[in-house]
Amino acid sequence: MATINQLVRKPRQATTYKSASPALDKCPQRRGVCTRVYTTTPKKPNSALRKVAKVRLTNQEEVISYIGGEGHNLQEHSVVLIRGGRVKDLPGVRYHTVRGSLDAAGVAKRRQARSKYGAKRPKA
């Protein structure tokens, strides 16, 4: 515990908020153009080819965004919507593409958790 004299000399410092997704500039989502669409491998215990895209946002920032779901139609110059949310086993990937919005098509034949992948309700 600090003494009163120590607190007079140097007051307590309030903890500063640090955003987990700074490129969004406090927006819920951001639009951007894919500059490169490629696959990458995850960190140590996991093994896969994860689909990611390098995206230039409307505020001129370049970020790496994860493309969720099975299969996608994205290529260079595709316009996508980006939301926050990191991928734990991909270092440097701190954003997700929103499926079913702009040029990113929803996941085909998706039955469960459809709203997360932009899939329409299947006909009964």
Swiss-Prot record:
Disulphide bond pairs: none
Keywords associated with the record: Methylation, Ribonucleoprotein, Ribosomal protein, RNA-binding, rRNA-binding, tRNA-binding
Annotated region (Disordered), positions in chain: 1-25
GO terms of molecular function: rRNA binding; structural constituent of ribosome; tRNA binding
Sites of 3-methylthioaspartic acid modification: 89
Domain of life: Bacteria
Signal peptide (from-to): none
Pfam families, A to Z: Ribosom_S12_S23
A biological process term (GO) from this entry: translation
Family: Belongs to the universal ribosomal protein uS12 family.
Physiological role: With S4 and S5 plays an important role in translational accuracy. Interacts with and stabilizes bases of the 16S rRNA that are involved in tRNA selection in the A site and with the mRNA backbone. Located at the interface of the 30S and 50S subunits, it traverses the body of the 30S subunit contacting proteins on the other side and probably holding the rRNA structure together. The combined cluster of proteins S8, S12 and S17 appears to hold together the shoulder and platform of the 30S subunit.
HAMAP family membership: Ribosomal_uS12_B
Protein name as annotated: Small ribosomal subunit protein uS12
Taxonomic source organism: Stenotrophomonas maltophilia (strain K279a)
Source species taxonomy: Bacteria, Pseudomonadati, Pseudomonadota, Gammaproteobacteria, Lysobacterales
Gene name per UniProt: rpsL
